[in-house]
Amino acid sequence: MRCPSCNSLDTQVKDSRPTEDSSVIRRRRVCVTCNFRFTTFERVQLRELTVIKRNGRRVPFDRDKLMRSVQISLRKRSVDPERVEKMVSAIVRELESGGESEVSSEAIGEIVMEHLRDLDDVAYVRFASVYRNFREAKDFEAVLGELSAEDETPRLAPVRK
């Protein structure tokens, strides 16, 4: 692992432990060259994903970019960061287990919107406004109408056997 301070490749792991949900391993490292201490996180990756952009360009999937876009939609919202992390992990897991190594940006956007709808209505509308490229107030009204209609529909409790 390259040291973020001096770019040396000579680093040592001082401590490793799983996170609370055991989906990530947190490693404390120290650079042998400059003694800089830093933390890295290790996640399981089921497969390499390639994103097909709207213009046809193919780019490697970037989990951090997904997290940033979700965090932008959640800005100034009181949502527990752990719930956000779990949601992003669930989205990535869903994409990786989908069976395809290439996924369209539209498909990713729809999955994110589906998860945001369950997490926070305001974040859902914010994300939708960028993802669907809203141009007029009626675009917002349509999405708000979807949310209102969903709220009015009674949800049945799951049947337990």
From Swiss-Prot:
A single GO molecular function term of this UniProt record: zinc ion binding
Region described as Disordered: 1-20
Zn-finger region bounds: unnamed: 3-34
Composition bias type Polar residues, residue spans: 1-11
Required cofactor names: Zn(2+)
InterPro entries tied to this protein: ATP-cone_dom, NrdR-like_N, RNR_NrdR-like
Domain ATP-cone: 49-139
Alphabetically ordered keywords of this record: ATP-binding, DNA-binding, Metal-binding, Nucleotide-binding, Repressor, Transcription, Transcription regulation, Zinc, Zinc-finger
Keyword Metal-binding tagged: yes
Record text on cofactor binding: Binds 1 zinc ion.
A Pfam family: Zn_ribbon_NrdR
GO biological process: negative regulation of DNA-templated transcription
Record family assignment: Belongs to the NrdR family.
Function, as annotated: Negatively regulates transcription of bacterial ribonucleotide reductase nrd genes and operons by binding to NrdR-boxes.
Protein name: Transcriptional repressor NrdR
Organism: Bradyrhizobium sp. (strain ORS 278)
Lineage: Bacteria, Pseudomonadati, Pseudomonadota, Alphaproteobacteria, Hyphomicrobiales
